[in-house]
Amino acid sequence: MDVRLHLKQFALLCFISLLLTPCGLACGPGRGYGKRRHPKKLTPLAYKQFIPNVAEKTLGASGKYEGKITRNSERFKELIPNYNPDIIFKDEENTNADRLMTKRCKDKLNSLAISVMNHWPGVKLRVTEGWDEDGHHLEESLHYEGRAVDITTSDRDKSKYGMLSRLAVEAGFDWVYYESKAHIHCSVKAENSVAAKSGGCFPGSGTVTLGDGTRKPIKDLKVGDRVLAADEKGNVLISDFIMFIDHDPTTRRQFIVIETSEPFTKLTLTAAHLVFVGNSSAASGITATFASNVKPGDTVLVWEDTCESLKSVTVKRIYTEEHEGSFAPVTAHGTIIVDQVLASCYAVIENHKWAHWAFAPVRLCHKLMTWLFPARESNVNFQEDGIHWYSNMLFHIGSWLLDRDSFHPLGILHLS
């Protein structure tokens, strides 16, 4: 038996080495995996276009207005001056107010300045408006918090402004608006914004149903647990819990609550997480979409104890709540029923099938471990806090292969 066990362990090590070989090749010199991708073609924004395509002060963009900052405010210390020599500040007030901004805004602006010089040699980024202390903007403008800038190029060539907008998006601004023929408006999330800390998770208080019918808080799930999930056709089944993509018991975040009335259910999850909704044009009748896209009148799939199948139920209302702790469980089938509502195990990218395919190595390793070590202690619950390394790696690979528009706006913050 010892010989067979050692052979199994040796086979596992060889298999893992084969899995990791492509990753090593990608980091090394030469051709193949390590070959540098051709720079993607950047598309200029159209006049009056804004990215992301939501209102500026919403969760998916720069977040809510938090109050005007004056020189006498306690929050004035949040503003730091930007003396980057590669940026021209108009400073028509002669107070250096335009140079004051939050750290996040400064970081994005400095990144954009480099992009501008690389794209148009000899041209610099120009800031016409930054922090405003004189009340020249609309009420609740993010200029009053040092979270917004209006920009042009140093040569004031209006034909460049569409591309300048695109470069600002690529630089990581949370909201970019080709606002006028005279400038581009860019803004960022607040430094302490709960929105800036949102990925794709459920609160720890959310519950799942185990194979024996009992309920269990998501935060207490352990490897070896079997929970209710569904296949691609929406049939309810029991699936193995494999791991947490994200495991954060302490951070306070903002969640979207999707509420139905008949029967009454509440699914609480972050904006970038995928949930299944009714779609008559899809072959299975359902499709996965970001929680932030769900609206009253849409239908979600609800499981009731009295029946074995999922029921299509109309969403009554959508609202937000803050909770402490967030967890993103992964099952062997890539789906999970949380608080009686069917959701995906994945987030950030709006394609459930792609995400599930990307986690195939994780599922395979789980099966191998079960086969190689059948006598190992079940219900192992140790996992370090934070985003799992495999998930983090996939995100960075995806960001290299796909356009930023392929990701949920909040998911892009992982790159910031």
From Swiss-Prot:
Keyword terms of this UniProt record: Autocatalytic cleavage, Calcium, Cell membrane, Developmental protein, Endoplasmic reticulum, Golgi apparatus, Hydrolase, Lipoprotein, Membrane, Metal-binding, Palmitate, Protease, Signal, Transferase, Zinc
GO molecular function per UniProt: calcium ion binding; cholesterol-protein transferase activity; patched binding; peptidase activity
Signal peptide segment: 1-26
A cellular component term, taken from the record's GO annotations: plasma membrane
Lipid-modified sites (Cholesterol glycine ester): G200
Binding site for Ca(2+) 2: E93, E129, D132, D134
Binding of Ca(2+) 1, residues: E92, E93, D98, T128, E129
Pfam family, one: Hint
Residues in coiled coil: none
InterPro entries: Hedgehog, Hedgehog_Hint, Hedgehog_sig/DD-Pept_Zn-bd_sf, Hedgehog_Signaling, Hedgehog_signalling_dom, Hint_dom_C, Hint_dom_N, Hint_dom_sf
Domain of life where this protein originates: Eukaryota
One GO BP annotation of this record: oligodendrocyte differentiation
Residues lipid-modified (N-palmitoyl cysteine): C27
Family from the record: Belongs to the hedgehog family.
Name this polypeptide is given: Tiggy-winkle hedgehog protein
Organism of derivation: Danio rerio (Zebrafish)
Chain's gene name: shhb
